[in-house]
Amino acid sequence: MDLLSTIVIGLIFINTLGAIITVFREPREISATWAWLLVLVFFPFLGFFIYFFFGRKISKDRIFDLKSQDTFGIRKLAEMQLEELEHDNTFFEDLYLKELAVLFLESDESVITKGNQVEIITTGQVKFTQLKEDLRNAKDHIHIGYYIFNDDELGRELLEILIEKAQQGVEVLVLYDALGSRFTKQKFWKKLHEAGGRSEAFFGYTFGIINLRMNYRNHRKIVVIDGKIGYVGGFNIGDEYLGKGKLGQWRDTHLRIRGNAVLSLQARFFIDWNATVSERYQKTFLPRYFPTLECLGDTSMQIVSTGPDNDYQKIKMGFVKMIYMAKKSIDIQTPYFIPDESVLEALQVAALSGVKVRIMVPCKPDHPFVYRATEYYCRNLLKDGVEIYLYEEGFLHAKTMVVDGVASTVGTSNFDMRSFRLNFEINAFIYDEEISCKLQDIFEKDIENCLLADEAYFKKQSRWKKLKQKFSRLLSPIL
């Protein structure tokens, strides 16, 4: 063996040993461990660089910051509701819905709110027209949290409204994700700051150039106006959400809420805001921000949050519980379908038990590896009787699930491992037959713009594409 061969073998050994030590020094799920080993072993040096920014777990100090907020008596209210549900079977006629609500009360202290008025929004034109009107009518405060807040025509138009309201004395706070809004420079916010408003980047860049926590993204989209009107769902702020991007028409689902669920959105915003800003700018859970609200509708719901700061993958647990409680049908819309074993098995059990399971995903990719992994998982569910629909009328970005037309969820969480484990997400879980049926009707209408992806469809794909699907599946725990 010559010297060069010895050096190469030595470097391979050192790289492999370093990969094993690096990955196993932090507890993580087995699938993610193997995926990171694959990256570190087969991409020497580059793999370690990628791991440094994307693979390290969130620090315990940061977890403490996110967990330690005083949440305006929410814990006590959740405990009261748990006790009430234990002795009262009249609120939930369906035992499975009661069990779902208890799951969130136990794991997330997510209180059940009643008497909400909910509007379902599926186009950017409707969403942003209504949002602008609500912002202009704000009297006391505007609290906004988005993954993406772009410096483009729509972003600048909304910013002008925020500046105007700040000049009028309305409290304006904007929280945006540093990675999602990476193309929006600090100077974009200058006039808002001069008017008295504030903007902050969640998990911002160190020294303005390096983001050491870029793998942990605040993917939530929250708007709260005067503690009375709230928005949550899939739309970010940018021209592409009006159909002006390269992906064409944008199909998403968002909720406009009036009622007590808005106070849950407010509490979530405060927790995220206070964990981001210095103590000087932290907000106190004052009655001003949590007004007493009249009953405006008939919808009951829970606002559920999840993230790497939690011990439980709460939204995923809710998805699994809903799937297992289905008796007739499950309709899922998601741009990215990369389920872990628990979700995959739940869907297989449902389909093989006679439940009609339909999954709708986009027909075009916006992330190559993610889309190929989505194709892999979709194809493998066909054998279990699951129907797969590819949305062709633009890009499908909605994140919804409807079960039996009686329960549903809308929010920011995709059906993928990133949303389950790494992102900070928020979803509304809705206990209302009318709203659930509306979402089901929307699904049916969307099918008119879909291609049914059956076995024949996938058989036509090239071997190269199938190879990319299998390779992407190996990386799925870290995509």
Which positions does each model-derived feature cover?
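Histidine/acidic-residue-rich catalytic or RNA/ligand-binding cores of hydrolases
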Residues: 342-344, 371-373, 403
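Active-site donor-binding acidic/aromatic loop of nucleotide-activated sugar
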Residues: 388-392
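Short alpha-helical functional segments enriched in proximate histidine and acidic residues
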Residues: 333
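Catalytic-core elements of nucleic-acid end-processing and repair enzymes
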Residues: 399
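Helical hairpin unit composed of two closely spaced alpha helices linked by a short loop
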Residues: 326, 336-358, 362, 367
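N-terminal localization/anchoring segments of enzymes in phospholipid and broader phosphate metabolism
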Residues: 1-317, 321, 325, 349, ...
